[in-house]
Amino acid sequence: MGARASVLSGGKLDKWEKIQLRPGGKKKYRLKHLVWASRELERFALNPNLLETVEGCRQIIRQLQPSLQTGSEELRSLFNTVATLYWVHQSIQVRDTKEALDKLEEEQNRTQQKTQQGKADKGVSQNYPIVQNLQGQMVHQALSPRTLNAWVKVIEEKAFSPEVIPMFSALSEGATPQDLNTMLNTVGGHQAAMQMLKDTINEEAAEWDRMHPVQAGPIPPGQIREPRGSDIAGTTSTLQEQITWMTSNPPIPVGEIYKRWIILGLNKIVRMYSPVSILDIRQGPKEPFRDYVDRFFRVLRAEQATQEVKNWMTETLLVQNANPDCRTILKALGSGATLEEMMTACQGVGGPGHKARVLAEAMSQVTNSAVMMQRGNFKGQRRIIKCFNCGKEGHLARNCRAPRKKGCWKCGKEGHQMKDCSERQANFLGKFWPLNKERPGNFLQNRPEPTAPPAESFGFGEKITPSLRQEMKDQEQGPPLTSLKSLFGSDPLSQ
């Protein structure tokens, strides 16, 4: 520990131990914080001996600062410790860690301003086609072959995909109409697309002439003429006129106007080269959500719509056209979820790991339900029990403490029990079952009588014996043949 604690000594160590960890807090820096910082530097593959000097602390700060946004709490604590130690080495008094960080930010801002001022003093930037020479005159600097080569390479590799438009905008920054025409003329193939671009430029030039008519009369001395549509397109204007328009006071940005026309035509070409509609972009069953989002926004860039419409497409169609697994997750996030939250939530959906996890969760729910049912914790619909003796709920009649009710528990009448009660027990004819054990009225009361004449009336059959004749006479004395007593018990014709 001795070697690690040798970072500070004497008066510097006393100043170190007077600095508070937090504004208004009681805890202060101690020697153990320097020991911890040395160990952390070794863990981050940095030399702990850098803590002993001002320049060493500055190098550590320069290494750790870019990682603060995504770093851990240990990394931030190490940065705060080194920043505080940086001011102790310079014998500059700070009260707490926050004051040390504020002073460090002020110092970095002053250094950055000096650097920018030094670059400005060296001369005008050479990144734009129109530059100022040593005599103070605005002159034109032609596009470099490197810029033209980059543009041609983009067209050859990407054809007219949506990313061509921002690439063209970046390469033509500050260009004159003559420079823009040079870039368009370097495109060898895709002549059909270039003809479409020329038609769009001619339409916009005609619209410009209609909105900006020529002033009547001669041009006053010392003034330049107003540019026409063909002048903006670079066909009827010279390079010097274009520079004059772009550098006059107030300036007429003919280069930016022409660039806007070209981008409008490129949008139409991109739309033609990307025939897929945003409505047709759907996520496959096993397609990762990240790849689906890439395809979605690639086609969205080619859509000819305002930014508000594109935002609506992103909020609605991105969720609607996802596969069922991702759509369930995205709807659970709500409508205010960011794209980062969506991609984080759907990461790994559709793969074998996700399917195994879903299956495990389903099996876990089934197992938990079975365990709860076995333990008697299943909360189903409880059956309400009611006492037939007192009429109250919560107990049965055999457990009732009230006096025993006489008679039937169902209808309240005496003379029969509840099992023999006919209350609300009617047959399908609407009549109650009789209390006696007779058959209901819709059943046969007795064996039906045959209505056919006797066999001897036809002159064939067995010989009639005296006993058989006596039996037939007894049957003739029975009820009339037209009686309905065989079917219904109370026949009015039999009375």
Curated annotation (Swiss-Prot):
Zinc finger motifs (CCHC-type), residue ranges: 385-402, 406-423
- Where is the segment annotated Interaction with Gp41? 7-31
Q: Where is this motif: Nuclear export signal?
A: 16-22
Per the record, which residues fall in region Interaction with membrane phosphatidylinositol 4,5-bisphosphate? 73-77
Sorted alphabetically, which SUPFAM superfamilies does this protein's record hold? Retroviral matrix proteins (SSF47836), Retrovirus capsid dimerization domain-like (SSF47353), Retrovirus capsid protein, N-terminal core domain (SSF47943), Retrovirus zinc finger-like domains (SSF57756)
Q: Where is the lipid attached (N-myristoyl glycine)?
A: G2
Among its keywords, does the record have Lipoprotein?
yes
Please list where the region (Interaction with host PPIA/CYPA and NUP153) is annotated: 185-223
Record GO terms (molecular function): RNA binding; structural molecule activity; zinc ion binding
> Which SMART domains does the protein's record reference?
ZnF_C2HC (SM00343)
**Interaction with membrane phosphatidylinositol 4,5-bisphosphate and RNA: annotated span:** 14-33
Q: Name the GO cellular-component terms.
A: host cell nucleus; host cell plasma membrane; host multivesicular body; membrane; viral nucleocapsid; virion membrane
Enumerate the UniProt keywords alphabetically: AIDS, Capsid protein, Host cell membrane, Host cytoplasm, Host endosome, Host membrane, Host nucleus, Host-virus interaction, Lipoprotein, Membrane, Metal-binding, Methylation, Myristate, Phosphoprotein, Repeat, RNA-binding, Viral budding, Viral budding via the host ESCRT complexes, Viral nucleoprotein, Viral release from host cell, Virion, Zinc, Zinc-finger
Where do the segments described as PPIA/CYPA-binding loop lie? 213-221
Q: Which residues carry this modification: Asymmetric dimethylarginine?
A: R382, R404
User: Where is the sequence biased in composition, kind Polar residues?
Assistant: 110-124
Which is a GO BP term held by this UniProt record?
viral translational frameshifting
Give the PANTHER family listed for this entry. Answer: ENDOGENOUS RETROVIRUS GROUP K MEMBER 24 GAG POLYPROTEIN-RELATED (PTHR40389), PTHR40389:SF4
Other comments on record: HIV-1 lineages are divided in three main groups, M (for Major), O (for Outlier), and N (for New, or Non-M, Non-O). The vast majority of strains found worldwide belong to the group M. Group O seems to be endemic to and largely confined to Cameroon and neighboring countries in West Central Africa, where these viruses represent a small minority of HIV-1 strains. The group N is represented by a limited number of isolates from Cameroonian persons. The group M is further subdivided in 9 clades or subtypes (A to D, F to H, J and K).
Q: Which family does the record assign?
A: Belongs to the primate lentivirus group gag polyprotein family.
UniProt note: domains: Late-budding domains (L domains) are short sequence motifs essential for viral particle budding. They recruit proteins of the host ESCRT machinery (Endosomal Sorting Complex Required for Transport) or ESCRT-associated proteins. p6-gag contains two L domains: a PTAP/PSAP motif, which interacts with the UEV domain of TSG101 and a LYPX(n)L motif which interacts with PDCD6IP/AIP1.
Please identify the protein, giving its name as recorded.
Gag polyprotein
Query: From which source organism is this entry?
Result: Human immunodeficiency virus type 1 group M subtype K (isolate 97ZR-EQTB11)
| Gene that encodes it | gag
